[in-house]
């Protein structure tokens, strides 16, 4: 909705907006995947959208959840609930869910972590693909991954989760 507001255009004309990695402060917002009227957002930054405006917009996206809590005094459950229904429908054989979603990742340089990736949820399960973006976007995603690893390791240190090397004993599908 931030792009729709900024460009005064219907959200339906904005395609393939993507955020990956963690949530909130560590979210990786990708401009290179997004298209407005068939033009790449990354090509519009610095011309039709000044770099400073893009950075402010990107921060509003990152802070979106916090903003909802500030306004309501609680988190919003409607949007995640709606997306959950779409995911369940896809898993039950409906139309595939093809938005970034949290998934267990152990490849592409991201190991033993739950993070938002490019996914496809179908009746056959959840599959993810390597994320493609600019060098700067990939650096932001790497930083998000490192932050998530720190959080994972803190939870392991508290004894809530076993060490990563023991995860296979709990779930043979985890290498």
Which ranges hold each PLM region?
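Long, compositionally biased stretches enriched for glycine and/or charged residues
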Residues: 4-175
């Amino acid at each position: 909705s931030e792009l729709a507001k900024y460009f005064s255009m219907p959200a339906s004309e904005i395609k393939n907006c993507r955020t990956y990695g963690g949530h909130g402060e560590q979210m990786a917002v990708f401009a290179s995947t997004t298209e407005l009227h068939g033009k790449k957002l990354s090509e519009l930054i610095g011309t039709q959208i000044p770099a400073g405006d893009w950075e402010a917009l990107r921060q509003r996206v990152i802070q979106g959840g916090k903003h909802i809590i500030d306004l309501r005094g609680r988190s919003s459950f409607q949007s995640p609930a709606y997306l959950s229904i779409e995911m369940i429908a896809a898993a039950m054989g409906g139309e595939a869910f093809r938005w970034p979603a949290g998934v267990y990742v152990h490849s592409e340089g991201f190991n033993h972590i739950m993070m938002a990736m490019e996914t496809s949820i179908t009746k056959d399960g959840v599959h993810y693909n390597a994320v493609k973006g600019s060098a700067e976007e990939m650096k932001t995603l790497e930083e998000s991954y490192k932050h998530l690893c720190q959080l994972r390791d803190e939870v392991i240190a508290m004894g809530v989760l076993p060490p990563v090397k023991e995860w296979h004993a709990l779930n043979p599908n985890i290498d």
